[in-house]
Amino acid sequence: LPICPSGSVNCQVSLGELFDRAVKLSHYIHFLSSEMFNEFDERYAQGRGFITKAVNGCHNASLTTPEDKEQAQQIHHEDLLNLVLGVLRSWNDPLLHLVTEVQRIKEAPDTILWKAVEIEEQNKRLLEGMEKIVGRVQPGDTGNEVYSRWSGLPSLQLADEDSRLFAFYNLLHCGRRDSHKIDNYLKLLKCRLIHDSNC
């Protein structure tokens, strides 16, 4: 989210504009995550029974996230903002390694690689934008809460192809799930903070 031209002084973008950009970006990331997961699923996961093994296996499962809009509405906006930061930060390492490791998958299509690179870049932009938003809403607080560390790199490098493909499948499955949650939380936060919940 390049908010102001470089070198500009006293450049101030409204909180509403920051949220508009964040919501658009999160929607785009979720779209890419879904496309990449579906493409991987069709190409590599058919008939392997991955979906039955993938339930609740995400690296950031320790971050308690509301499951639906009703639950999210019960959470104070400051806590929800910090939760969004925590989830976004928990994806820094996995996305970085996904870009590298996906190139080693046999006959990996360029479209999957391109989406991995794009999601990694856009996640960084969204995180920067969210840090700006948090700085405005909660001055002095950049949400430095503990977030889930990722230790899944060895599983993306396993010699056994089935196990390795399942590790990719699971990571992409979690990415799609989390990007959907972030998208929903940001829409809710925008409604609450910008439109005084009149949405």
From Swiss-Prot:
It comes from the Eukaryota. PROSITE patterns: SOMATOTROPIN_1 (PS00266). It is found in: Secreted. GO terms for molecular function: hormone activity. The keyword Acetylation does not apply. InterPro entries: 4_helix_cytokine-like_core, Somatotropin/Prolactin, Somatotropin_CS. Keywords: Disulfide bond, Glycoprotein, Hormone, Secreted. Disulfide bonds join C4-C11, C58-C174, C191-C199. It holds the Pfam family Hormone_1. GO terms for cellular component: extracellular space. Glycosylated. One of its GO terms (biological process) is positive regulation of receptor signaling pathway via JAK-STAT. Glycans are attached at N60. Belongs to the somatotropin/prolactin family. PANTHER family: PROLACTIN (PTHR11417:SF5), SOMATOTROPIN,PROLACTIN (PTHR11417). This is Prolactin-1.
